[in-house]
């Protein structure tokens, strides 16, 4: 779900990074569901890293984010502000701007990951797939 339990996934990824001496990476969160239409506990979130380092023998899945046209929004805030913003994107921004979303998951690239910070503050770029 889209809740504080996401922190555990990020903590496990931190252990993976340290165990594999990965120092250069991006933290990416995939939002598979629209929280405006699906209950938060039923929404799927995937914590991801992007790195150029090749890691052998890992059981972690590897995938690529689908290409296409994405709207980008830069924001910062505290725990829960991202979900309020996502609600705004789907309920106000899309209708006001004449775009539609696609089935591709939206995602965030974190420059400060609130799930790993004691104060739960984040800085991120949020990307949502769009079409006319």
Can you say where each PLM-predicted feature lies in the sequence?
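A solvent-exposed interaction/effector surface
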Residues: 1-132
């Amino acid at each position: 779900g889209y809740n504080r339990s996401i922190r555990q996934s990020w903590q496990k990824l931190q252990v993976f990074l340290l165990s594999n001496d990965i120092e250069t990476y991006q933290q990416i969160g995939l939002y598979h569901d629209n929280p405006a239409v699906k209950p938060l506990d039923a929404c799927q979130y995937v914590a991801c890293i992007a790195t150029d380092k090749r890691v052998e023998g890992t059981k972690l899945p590897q995938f690529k984010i689908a290409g296409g046209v994405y709207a980008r929004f830069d924001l910062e805030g505290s725990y829960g502000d991202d979900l309020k913003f996502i609600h705004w994107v789907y309920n106000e921004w899309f209708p006001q701007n004449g775009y539609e979303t696609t089935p591709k998951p939206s995602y965030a690239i974190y420059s400060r990951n609130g799930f790993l910070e004691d104060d739960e503050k984040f800085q991120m770029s949020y990307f949502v797939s769009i079409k006319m």
